[in-house]
Amino acid sequence: MPKTVFRKGETIEETLRRFKREVSKSGVLAEARRKEHYIKPSVQKKNRQKNMRSKKR
């Protein structure tokens, strides 16, 4: 998890904006959304194969 420290003379909005940027760059939220629900390995394999087929077209 990214950590953000207040800089001297920085407003809360600027610090929050910097924190949000660091979180999006690190991919923490994307991974949390991806792991929100359990997906069986067989379903993961089907999805992977489906994506590969669509990318070949």
Curated annotation (Swiss-Prot):
<comment type="similarity">
    <text>Belongs to the bacterial ribosomal protein bS21 family.</text>
</comment>
<protein>
    <recommendedName>
        <fullName>Small ribosomal subunit protein bS21</fullName>
    </recommendedName>
</protein>
<keyword id="KW-0687">Ribonucleoprotein</keyword>
<feature type="region of interest" description="Disordered">
    <location>
        <begin position="34"/>
        <end position="57"/>
    </location>
</feature>
<dbReference type="InterPro" id="IPR038380">
    <property type="entry name" value="Ribosomal_bS21_sf"/>
</dbReference>
<dbReference type="GO" id="GO:0005840">
    <property type="term" value="C:ribosome"/>
</dbReference>
<keyword id="KW-0689">Ribosomal protein</keyword>
<dbReference type="GO" id="GO:0003735">
    <property type="term" value="F:structural constituent of ribosome"/>
</dbReference>
<dbReference type="InterPro" id="IPR001911">
    <property type="entry name" value="Ribosomal_bS21"/>
</dbReference>
<dbReference type="Pfam" id="PF01165">
    <property type="entry name" value="Ribosomal_S21"/>
</dbReference>
<feature type="compositionally biased region" description="Basic residues">
    <location>
        <begin position="43"/>
        <end position="57"/>
    </location>
</feature>
<dbReference type="GO" id="GO:0006412">
    <property type="term" value="P:translation"/>
</dbReference>
<dbReference type="GO" id="GO:1990904">
    <property type="term" value="C:ribonucleoprotein complex"/>
</dbReference>
